[in-house]
């Protein structure tokens, strides 16, 4: 299936909490289809030194949330970016709204370098 517009949120979500659920809900307001990209255990170990829940456990919880339409793995890269997840969403949609929350802003979003001139990718922070 191909979509006009999808929202994408990415993160470790380890453990998932009410702030994440609010983040997902706000992201869903930008489109009719919400994709949640979950970082791997390896990514979490590099960022935090360890992980609490496996990718499979986090995905199982998140995929059962009413507002979530799809769950994907965020491919690891050298920058710790979500560029691979954006690429996956571009395969199924005309437009991707990449929604950033938590510790990300315009000054520390590596995905901007690659996609800021791509008319099919929009960025939201909040």
Residues of each region from the PLM?
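Nucleotidyltransferase catalytic core that binds NTPs
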Residues: 1-126
């Amino acid at each position: 299936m191909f979509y006009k517009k999808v929202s994408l949120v990415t993160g470790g979500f380890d453990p998932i909490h009410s702030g994440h659920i609010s983040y997902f809900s706000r992201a869903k307001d930008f489109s009719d289809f919400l994709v949640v990209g979950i970082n791997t255990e390896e990514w979490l170990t590099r960022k935090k030194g360890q992980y609490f829940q496996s990718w499979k456990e986090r995905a199982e919880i998140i995929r059962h949330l009413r507002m979530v339409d799809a769950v994907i793995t965020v491919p690891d890269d050298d920058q710790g970016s979500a560029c691979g997840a954006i690429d996956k969403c571009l395969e199924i949609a005309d437009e991707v709204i990449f929604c950033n929350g938590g510790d990300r802003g315009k000054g520390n979003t590596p995905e901007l370098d690659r996609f800021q001139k791509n008319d099919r990718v929009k960025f939201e922070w909040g």
